[in-house]
Amino acid sequence: EIILPDEVDGLMILGGATNPFLSDEFNQINLNGSVERLVESITLIKKYTEAKIIFTGGSGSIKKPKMDHARIAKQFFMQIGLDTDKMIFENKSRNTYENVLYSKNIAKPKKNEKWIVITSAFHMNRAIFIGEKNNWTLTPYAVDFTQPKKFIFKLNLNLLNNLNLMQRGSHEWIGLMAYYLMGRTSRIL
């Protein structure tokens, strides 16, 4: 169970829950398997009505810089009736490091401010560690869980699911190690 503070100064929602290419191709919002980043953020936006809100997510593609997650997320939030004028949509970042850095530059958090970061559970450590390295303490709000709290070893013959989990896990471990070696974080665990 996630225990949240009564008041926070800001929410940082990491991109990665939309598919900008398909959204543009079919002229409708296209969400992916990390949609919980958007869905759960709605609850926090409604709970913390005075908080600053930054959605961070650019393109990640050098060839298609206008295919950014922030633009599609803004459309999503508008469609469900949230006031997007009170939100900041950062659309230049291309990776988690830039998500946190650019958001910090926008937020300009004071020392005692409380900020919550919303991202997938498998991705949370990287976001938190980048914040730590840049003197920004973030409270984690993990979503998009792929495993139960209590690990139970059992034979699972669902090959596609197993490959997907292995890909996600290896991607994050490589990312944690690479960011540590590049000096973007101070630790990997």
Where are these regions (language model features)?
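A structural signal for short, hydrophobic/glycine-enriched beta-strand patches
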Residues: E1-L160
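A transmembrane-helix-recognition feature enriched in membrane-embedded lipid enzymes
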Residues: M166-I188
